[in-house]
Amino acid sequence: MIDFGNLKYENGLIIGIVQDRASKEVLMCAYMNREALEKTVETGIAHFWSRSRQKLWKKGETSGHLQKVKEIRIDCDMDSVLLLVEQVGGACHMGYRSCFYRNLDGEVVGEKVFEPEDVY
């Protein structure tokens, strides 16, 4: 196993890209610190670092829309990680399956899977 201390963090953080293992759809990206990576490996559930709240958070902690991590890959520069997951519910807090639900023109192209006001 790669030593998480050897990853190239910037200000203690590394980008975590989340992809649905089955469909290959990119679901989201978020920052992770070493603790988030370790907790993700330990529990099998995606954990991230919230820059706004300055704390560790488990994806789906409030909504129940967990990301069950099936595999973690490290990129060639060792400065980002890819989490291949089984997504439970939507990944986006706006109610969409993916955070990448709009194209450059602002057109909604993603699938809405829940109403945020019913969850948060």
UniProtKB/Swiss-Prot annotation:
A GO term from the CC aspect: cytoplasm
Cofactors (names): Mg(2+); Zn(2+)
Major subcellular location class: cytoplasm
Binding site for Mg(2+): 75, 77, 79
GO biological process: L-histidine biosynthetic process
Catalysed reaction, written as an equation: 1-(5-phospho-beta-D-ribosyl)-5'-AMP + H2O = 1-(5-phospho-beta-D-ribosyl)-5-[(5-phospho-beta-D-ribosylamino)methylideneamino]imidazole-4-carboxamide
GO molecular function terms noted in the UniProt entry: magnesium ion binding; phosphoribosyl-AMP cyclohydrolase activity; zinc ion binding
Binding site for Zn(2+): 76, 92, 99
Enzyme class: hydrolase
Keywords for this protein: Amino-acid biosynthesis, Cytoplasm, Histidine biosynthesis, Hydrolase, Magnesium, Metal-binding, Zinc
Any Pfam family: PRA-CH
Function: Catalyzes the hydrolysis of the adenine ring of phosphoribosyl-AMP.
Family membership: Belongs to the PRA-CH family.
Subunit record text: Homodimer.
Identification of the protein by name: Phosphoribosyl-AMP cyclohydrolase
Species assigned in the record: Methanosarcina mazei (strain ATCC BAA-159 / DSM 3647 / Goe1 / Go1 / JCM 11833 / OCM 88) (Methanosarcina frisia)
Gene name per UniProt: hisI
